[in-house]
Amino acid sequence: MTMIRKRLLIALSMTILLLMGCSKETVPSEPESTENDETVDAVTEVSDESENMEIAEVEEAEVAETVEPKYITIDFTGVTETHAEGDSVIPLKWNILSEEDNGIDFADEWYASENLSLPMIGTDWNSFSDENYEYLWEGEDLYIYENGTGNCLYVLHYPTDKWYVNGNNAYLKDGIFYGASVANGYAQPNTCFMFAYDLKNEKLLWRSADQSYNSMNFVVEGDVLICGYGFTAEPDYLYQINRNTGEIIDRLLLKKMPDLIVEQDGKLYVHTYSYNYVIEIE
């Protein structure tokens, strides 16, 4: 009887164990985490966005570098001496230090002997520069380029004798262009003057008196423009013009017409047809 019970208990235990084994649910394996995939996707998106931003910046820079120049024609028809409202200017003091007969030499030879030079580019006398711009005459048009970028900002057309599309006879400051219109020959009405022109608003600000300019260049000294005029059987002068108004504020009589002017160390080196002048200014 005892043996039978033992066998029954063993059989019952085995049955229970067997049933328990069959009843266990199979735990499905968890899918691999997608966290890594999401991180990779995020990095890829950031990389793509950065690349797109860089491309956009390059495209914007290219657009900025290829700005189209502004073409302006300045017409002086019917325009007489005109002055603008502006600050008055005290004339520079000047004193002739030397006056020498030059034997009718070339200006560049004298300047070279004095270790001086005009801000010319090349040897064709049609291109020159200042601290901000390069000016280039091509035919009867003046091209103004920005230093650094090389962008052509303006192309200006205005009447002046071809002989005078040489030398550094243009100046751009704060959007105002300073230039000159010259007719070669004896004095004529409405000729040989300097002018100031607002390039943004395309407006003439002032026009100096007739026969106040036929030198090949002018010098800028703060608010004073120094230039010259003269011709056969006419008085020959250096002029000081108020850059704000266009008014002549002083003049200095010379023996011959001033054609080129160089400033260095507080002195003007003025070349004329047959005389060289050194003039102190302060």
Task: List each language-model region with its residue ranges.
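C-terminal motif of bacterial Sec signal peptides marking the signal peptidase cleavage site
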Residues: 18-21
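Bacterial lipoprotein signal-peptidase II cleavage site
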Residues: 23-30
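Aromatic (tryptophan-biased) beta-strands that constitute blades/sheets of beta-rich domains
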Residues: 65-120, 151-163, 203-210, 237, ...
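Repeated scaffold domains used in trafficking and secretory/extracellular systems
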Residues: 80-82, 115-129, 160-173, 210-222, ...
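Short, solvent-exposed loop/turn segments at conserved positions within beta-propeller repeat blades
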Residues: 136-138, 185-191, 230-236
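A short loop-to-beta-strand structural motif that recurs across blades of beta-propeller domains
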Residues: 141-143, 193-195, 237-239, 275-277
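Short loop/turn segments that connect beta-strands within beta-propeller blades
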Residues: 147-149, 198-201, 242-245, 281-282
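Blade-level signature of beta-propeller repeat domains, shared across WD40, Kelch, NHL, RCC1
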Residues: 259-282
